[in-house]
A protein has these predicted regions:
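N-terminal leader/targeting and accessory segments in enzymes
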Residues: 1-16, 262-270
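Walker A (P-loop) phosphate-binding motif
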Residues: 5-67, 170-172
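C-terminal accessory "lid"/substrate-recognition subdomains
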Residues: 139-271
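Rossmann-fold NAD(P)-dependent oxidoreductase module
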Residues: 37, 41, 117, 241
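A generic structural signal for alpha->beta connector loops
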Residues: 15, 45, 88-89, 110, ...
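Phosphate/Mg2+-binding loops and adjacent switch elements
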Residues: 54-189
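Conserved beta-strand elements of the Class I
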Residues: 49-51, 132, 225-229
Length: 271
């Protein structure tokens, strides 16, 4: 960071706006849902390109998402984004973001907005706007640097952000709670602070032909037993959501971005 701030290491600036969505804590703040939210809000006005590293993919270098892409090729997050928005936007992965942006613009010169997923620490790209996420239940001002805590860099890194979003907020936040975040984050006047929360969608059957009536979350009877299988960094907000609906939740937790195997399926069936 010091080398970039002193101009010893150079940042690449691009002719199109580049919006960075990231965090300063390890995993679980909701970067990909917020990227999808931005895509949905802006895709009618812009030709959008989304670029990420492609976490846990088996490939290397630049890979452009296509109908033939698998999660193993481009990472599960990029795969999810492409499945949702498909050919209406350009999705690619590349470890070197400068190279990735250049390749995307070569392939599709109509792109006039780039979204970088999880690139706040990748400073070789000069962002037009930097958006940093911090989780409501574990905000940066209550966290510590690795390895004691989860912070990738110090709280002072927030000074580079244009926008800070407190994610996964409860639906019943009180005005005083908003004020606590404002005071503890202590942002500069030029920085904007927002708060977001999840609205969980409807249940989608894994095997549609085997299910006649898909229940909704709201239709769950008190005490309904649910086996919840997760492969995300922090499943607690979702589990709390289900328990508020009086469901009897049994959690089967796998690691973030877990690649499910046949033996996992056998283990789940035993539950």
């Amino acid at each position: 960071n010091k080398l970039f701030e002193q101009g010893i290491l150079k940042q690449q600036e691009f002719s199109v706006p580049v919006v960075v969505v990231g965090n300063i804590a390890m995993g679980g703040t909701g970067k990909t849902p917020h990227v999808e939210y931005i895509v949905e809000a802006l895709m009618e006005k812009y030709n959008i390109g989304v670029l990420s590293r492609g976490y846990k993919r088996s490939t290397k270098g630049f890979v452009l998402a296509s109908q033939q892409s698998r999660p193993e090729d481009i990472g599960d997050e990029s795969y999810q984004i492409y499945r949702k928005f498909g050919p209406e936007i350009t999705v690619a992965v590349c470890e070197k973001r400068v190279d990735g942006i250049n390749r995307m613009l070569e392939i599709n010169p109509k792109i006039n907005l780039i979204l970088l997923d999880d690139a706040f620490q990748h400073r070789y790209v000069k962002p037009s706007v930097s958006i940093v996420l911090t989780e409501h239940n574990r905000p940066v001002f209550k966290d510590s640097l690795l390895p004691y805590g989860r912070l990738r860099e110090s709280r002072g890194a927030l000074n580079r952000a244009d926008i800070v979003i407190v994610t996964k907020c409860p639906p019943d936040m009180k005005p005083m709670q908003y004020r606590i975040f404002e005071e503890n984050l202590n942002l500069f006047p030029f920085q904007k602070l927002y708060f977001s929360r999840y609205n969980y969608g409807h249940l989608v059957p894994v095997f549609p032909d085997a299910v006649e009536n898909v229940p909704s979350f709201d239709s769950l009877d008190p005490g309904t037993p649910l086996l919840v299988v997760t492969g995300v960094a922090n499943p607690k907000p979702f589990v709390r959501y289900l328990r508020r609906r009086k469901a009897k939740v049994k959690l089967k937790r796998f690691g973030d971005h877990h690649n499910f195997s046949s033996s996992d399926m056998v283990e789940i069936e035993k539950e």
